[in-house]
Amino acid sequence: MGRLKLHSGIKAIEEEPEDFECTDSSNTTTLACMIDTEIAAVLAVMRRNVRWGGRYMSGDDQLEHSLIQSLKALRKQVFSWNQPWHTISPMLYLQPFLDVIRSDETGAPITSIALSSVYKILNLNVIDQNTANIEDAMHLVVDSVTSCRFEVTDPASEEVVLMKILQVLLACMKNKASVMLSNQHVCTVVNTCFRVVHQAGMKGELLQRVARHTMHELVRCIFSHLPDVERTETTLVNRAGSIKQEKAGVDSDYAIVSKPVEDGNANSEYDVENSMATFATGAQSLMDDGPVGPGSRKPASPYDLHIMTEPYGVPSMVEIFHFLCSLLNVVEHVGMGSRSNTIAFDEDVPLFALNLINSAIELGGSSIRHHPRLLSLIQDELFRNLMQFGLSMSPLILSMVCSIVLNLYQHLRTELKLQLEAFFSCVILRLAQGKYGPSYQQQEVAMEALVNFCRQKSFMVEMYANLDCDITCSNVFEELSNLLSKSTFPVNCPLSAMHILALDGLIAVIQGMAERISNGLTGLDLGPVHLDEYTPFWMVKCDNYSDPNHWVSFVRRRKYIKRRLMIGADHFNRDPKKGLEFLQGTHLLPDKLDPQSVACFFRYTAGLDKNLVGDFLGNHDEFCVQVLNEFAGTFDFQYMNLDTALRLFLETFRLPGESQKIQRVLEAFSERYYMQSPEILANKDAALVLSYSIIMLNTDQHNVQVKKKMTEEDFIRNNRHINGGNDLPREFLSELFHSICNNEIRTTPEQGAGFPEMTPSRWIDLMHKSKKTAPYILADSRAYLDHDMFAIMSGPTIAAISVVFDHAEHEDVYQTCIDGFLAIAKISACHHLEDVLDDLVVSLCKFTTLLNPSSVDEPVLAFGDDAKARMATITIFTIANKYGDYIRTGWRNILDCILRLHKLGLLPARVASDAADESEHSSEQGQGKPLANSLSSAHLQSMGTPRRSSGLMGRFSQLLSLDTEEPRSQPTEQQLAAHQRTLQTIQKCHIDSIFTESKFLQAESLLQLARALIWAAGRPQKGTSSPEDEDTAVFCLELLIAITLNNRDRIVLLWQGVYEHIATIAQSTVMPCNLVDKAIFGLLRICQRLLPYKESLADELLRSLQLVLKLDARVADAYCEQIAIEVSRLVKANANHIRSQAGWRTITSLLSITARHPEASESGFDAVSFVMSEGTHLYPANYVLCVDAARQFAESRVGQSERSIRALDLMGDSLEFLAKWALSAKENMGEEDFGKMSQDIGEMWLRLVQGLRKVCLDQREDVRNHALQSLQKCLGGVDGINLAHSMWSQCFDKVIFTVLDDLLEIAAGSQKDYRNMEGTLLLAIKLLSKVFLQQLQELSQLSTFCKLWLGVLTRMEKYMKVKVRGKKSDKLQESVPELLKNILLVMKTKGVLLQRSALGGDSLWELTWLHVNNIAPSMRLELFPDQESSQLGDDETVSNGLSSPENTTGS
């Protein structure tokens, strides 16, 4: 039952005893010699004394003194012992020495040497629990030493004896056989030591220190065994009766009581037995009499005596610990708010006691929780004293109190939830803020203690989970984190150690959160909490407080409710009715109010206006009365004095002033109190009357306006016969009277200002609550609640660390701040708190202000010399690279830093590179070419000029070089070092990674980065802008294009913004410049690179190139050649990916523009040739567009006739693809689709021949003639194309007849501009003849054949009459009749031209000969001799009727 296990050994604390193996005779002999030596030493000292030495010199035959006889007898025996030493009873060889010690005839020197002998024997390690008769021997040693008597001859020898006594008692406790000591003996040892400690205050310094050290070692030795002690819950709980705690302390059934020390003169006899503390059973507590005052014994029960005589264990430890706690009670004047400065006593005794208590807790550790009485002492009496001494003026005491609480937190926090809350609220927060009068030293100690707690990884999490998320507890985490943040701020003062200390605490909390992130995801759904309906929540418990799957969601919900309740309390304080309505609307009160829920709201919600609560509870309304009764029912008044219960009740609201309201309130209180504590009071009426009487006494005693105060007798007399007609016990009423007189009941409690004072009634309430409070939640190493916690503290924390960083001057402080910033960034990113990360970036960017070129003369050197700016810069870009996914508006500030570095020329040469397909942009590209890695330079250079001093090494070389105008001195070593530091800083930033790795950014972050680049570039203005602004805009545009190209898979996300930005630049620029250069060619690069990957966006990408078509003429002309090259590249690389007509229209438009540009036309034509020559990239969608583009090149005089002829060949050769498409359509399509396709192909063919028709009018003879040949080829090679009959009619009207007419007109009027028109006309008339004959069969089917035939004849007739250079053409005169004759023969052969033709009757026949006669009169006779004579008369008729043009046209 709570005893030490015999097998556990003593944990030595101080000296290692000599080790002897007593298994052989030689060792037995050795030990015998040692004991003989000690006997000799004692006898020698005794002989020196006159009293003892004279007996040997006497001649009388007197017997020797019994002390000497026993020593000599031992001397005779000791060498005769041959058995193993452990079988010899220690009493045999200890008794003679102990007799000397106990004798009152021996002086101090003799007693001292005897004590030394016992000490040596105990330290020989020859005695253990297995030694014979060891129990009696150990008891004898303790009894003898604690009963030591000796004559005091001088103070020094007295102190030596006392020190020897301490040595022997400590050796007893450290000996392996100490387990055989009883609880009573252990208490006696401790009491004896304490008496020496107490007396040492009046003696030498050395004795004081030795006594205290021994006391300390004793406590350590005793409590080091607690982990080895069997659990004692059952044994101790089953003891008689229950432990009452009404006096806020554990009243032991046995206690150490001390007797006073009587001071004697130098020759007086010293009696340790009478001067030491003696053991007494009973309930007389040292709390009342003090550890050094007289104590009265009371008879001990047989059970108590039984416990105390058993081998020592928990009972003695409980007694000792209770004794140590009681030492704190004798100095209550050191209490809260005390300003006494009697440090000598105020510090000495409490410090001594606190040190001993701390040692006991350190060694007992978590084992204490298994022993209810020890735990109860700590929960109540110890913690109450700690709360008191925590507000001591002494920093030493405060420091020790904080150390004890930290140890208790480590070992017993699950049992001390509310005690810890009270300590932080009433002590740490109060002192650390420094607002309520503590000294700077107190404030510093409190802050150090808080920081120590923050360094415990789970401390803040557990405070948040157990207290902040408990509706009935204060927000300790929130208050502590706010305190740390505020204490970090230097307000109108330089940075001090206190600020750095608070910073350390803040960083410790943040880094704890960051470390938990590394421990893996929680796997829990931690989304926002909502309340959809009211459910009673005040007394709800979690299903399992040890399983995160249960408690995490539970406490988050409780915190949400608590936060909403705070808002509700604020509404209630402004208007109680609207406040309750608000709570109903947020489902914190039921839709129909019930008394219990409103009562709980009043009872457990912090921050309520207590005046309003009191008025509500005192109201006569029936509902309010019900609420009052329910409110009283929430209190636990069991085992509580009436005045304590009343104090507790009235602290929760302000007692109304009206008597009726007071009556109602006290009635509710009295009924509840009587229900729970009916021991003394006869009925609830007695409780009511007495409560009224207490209120009246309180007013009488503490109202300054009352001159004549009520006496104790008056109070007792006033309360006669109130207890059911009988009197209450006088002692009971007297106790009430003095309690009220000494401690006022505050009926007007303070409204939440400042920190609560831990009054006795509040402490009793806390102890009652602690029995019912929710279990303490132990947090593991995962980030269950960090999101919610960090959201609370992030803002103040960033501000606090930033202020310290701003004010700091030492690099170690800088590094601490940087560690904090990086931890904040990590947490923000992990929990997706984008706003927090943005705030952090904004704060950090402020510290790079030295990068601003205007702030200093040599910004690069200044940057290199400024450690703070360099560290901040590295941190910003570390955050951007690591946590860029969660940066939003912060990109603007980051870009601001990048632009500052860019303006100084400090950026590495590849920041703006798109890091993809670099081979695409080689150094061979000429002037005006957009280079992917053309990087920011400090100053704009003219186009094509090599950039000097762009980038960091350029700046460095500038520093090293000699200026041509003003020679510079060589840079100093400091300047070189500063430049080297700058170089290293920029390298560590990895700025280029932000953009090259942008493909890994989350979509929203990427979009914000792009927007930030557009914003940073600024809006281009029409007209001239400063070179610096343009350089910035160019740099931003390069970066924007780089991230666009790096994010081709997400181009849809970026495209709108990128396009609009480039469009703004293109449309606002009226002169060639670097910015529009980057914009145009950046756009072309984007299209080139993205078309293969985003066919769905191809039309939009290509449509964007229309911006190039809209460029100002001067700009377009300057870049036309390069545009052509880029478009040509685009076409060659992506022709397969351009499918739509709209896309090709843009491309061909761009190519067509180049046709007339001297430098650009070659590239443009190259692209057109690429598309049309092989035909692999020619589609129905782009056919007409490509033909038109080729026509532009054919008509262009740039590139000589050869290129025009090549263009005509492209047009002519394209006919075969029409035939292929027609054949493919016929084979693969249905009838309907084929018909539509044939129609489309016919339209394409018509557009082809119309295009060729236009080129047939070219001034250049070879081009013109080649065009006619190509036209003839295209008109004649239509066999594979299914042209509709009507198409030929259009063809003759719009193409063939038109080109013949136009050429005829040119021949007639523009002879000077057109050379050798005769050959062209000849080709044209041959074209007409050939096409007509080839298509005669088709044409003859037309209803308009007559009209078409008339057109042919008319043109032939005109060409016969045409004059070239003033005379008729011989070639035409010769060719036209021949061609006509050929036509007529074919028509005759095919039956088209007959005298009575079915197609046109006589009119076609007559019409034909009318015109033929004008060309060749003899042809009719030659071709139709048989019909000549019969038709002579008819010719005249026809001639008369159809000779006019109107009639001719009408036919």
From Swiss-Prot:
Domain SEC7: 557-752
Annotated PROSITE patterns: SEC7
Active site, per annotation: E658
Gene null: resulting phenotype: Lack of morphological features of apical-basal polarity resulting of no root, no true hypocotyl and abnormal shoot apical meristem. Cell wall alterations. Defects in cell adhesion. Aberrant leaf venation.
Activity regulation as described: Inhibited by brefeldin A (BFA).
Domain of life: Eukaryota
Compartment list: Cytoplasm, Cytosol; Endosome membrane; Cell membrane
Region (Disordered): 1430-1451
Main subcellular localisation: cytoplasm
Subunit-structure text: Homodimer. Interacts with CYP19-4/CYP5 in vitro.
Reported function: Activates the ARF proteins by exchanging bound GDP for free GTP. Plays a role in vesicular protein sorting. Acts as the major regulator of endosomal vesicle trafficking but is also involved in the endocytosis process. Could function redundantly with GNL1 in the retrograde Golgi to endoplasmic reticulum trafficking. Regulates vesicle trafficking required for the coordinated polar localization of auxin efflux carriers which in turn determines the direction of auxin flow.
Designated name of the protein: ARF guanine-nucleotide exchange factor GNOM
Source species: Arabidopsis thaliana
Gene: GN
